[in-house]
Design a protein with these regions (language model features):
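Cysteine-centered iron-sulfur cluster-binding motifs in ferredoxin-type domains/subunits
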Residues: 1, 166-186
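FMN-binding flavodoxin-like domain, especially the glycine-rich phosphate-binding loop
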Residues: 2-18, 24-37, 41-159
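Short, charged alpha-helical interaction segments and adjacent helix-coil junctions
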Residues: 158-167
Length: 186
C-alpha cells in the first residue's frame, strides 16, 4: 500500500479478486503494474499463483515491477513471479524485495516489540528507496536476499501451509479478523 499511495496508483487486492472472481483488468497506455507478495517457504503463496494464472490484462502496459516481502530470505519468490508472469506474456522490468518481520508464528517469535519495530523502520527506509526507483522506472533485479535455486526449496510448502500447526491462546480477543482476512477461507 505504501508504494501505491506514494505513486498514486490504484490498489487491487489479490485476496478480494479471488473472492469475487474478478481477474479482468484494462490498463491505460503505458500504465505501471506492480505485483506485491509475501514470501511463503522461499516461494509464492498459492493464492498469488492462482491469481496470476487467471489474470487477464488488456491494454499496453508501460512498466512492470514485482515486490516480495520476506522474513529471512526471499528465496525463489522473484524467480517464480517472473516465470508465472512470463506465461501470461508479461515481462518484468524490475524486481524488488523488502525484509519485514516474519509472521509465520509456529517458528518465529514476534513478542520482542523492539526487534519488530526496528525491522519495520529498516523496511520503511528500503521502501522509500524502492518508491524512488519505481518513479524513475528503474530496470533490473533489486531482490537482494534471493538465493540460487531458491524456488527448489518450495516443495514443502503444501505441507507447511496447513493450518493444523496454528492455535490461539488466552490473549486472543476473538475478533475474527484472522478468519475474515484469510485469503483461502481457513
Amino acid at each position: 500500500m505504501q508504494v501505491a499511495n506514494a505513486t498514486s496508483d490504484r490498489i487491487i487486492s489479490i485476496s478480494e479478486c479471488l473472492k469475487t472472481s474478478n481477474f479482468d483488468f484494462s490498463v491505460k497506455e503505458g500504465e505501471t503494474i506492480g505485483i506485491a507478495s509475501p514470501v511463503y517457504n522461499f516461494g509464492l503463496p498459492v493464492t498469488v499463483i492462482d491469481f496470476i494464472n487467471k489474470l487477464n490484462i488488456s491494454g499496453n502496459i508501460g512498466y512492470v515491477f514485482t515486490l516480495v516481502t520476506f522474513g529471512g530470505l526471499s528465496g525463489g519468490a522473484s524467480i517464480m513471479l517472473k516465470s508465472e508472469l512470463k506465461k501470461k506474456g508479461i515481462k518484468i522490468n524490475a524486481q524488488y524485495s523488502v525484509r519485514m518481520p516474519d509472521t509465520w508464528t509456529p517458528v518465529y517469535d514476534l513478542s520482542d516489540k523492539n526487534k519488530v519495530t526496528e525491522t519495520n523502520k529498516k523496511a520503511d527506509i528500503k521502501i522509500s528507496g524502492i518508491i524512488n526507483k519505481i518513479i524513475k522506472k528503474s530496470k533490473g533485479n533489486f531482490d537482494s536476499r534471493r538465493i540460487p535455486f531458491g524456488d527448489k526449496f518450495y516443495g514443502g510448502y503444501e505441507e507447511m501451509r496447513k493450518t493444523s500447526s496454528l492455535s490461539v491462546n488466552d490473549s486472543c480477543v476473538g475478533c475474527g479478523l484472522c478468519a475474515k482476512e484469510c485469503p483461502v477461507g481457513a
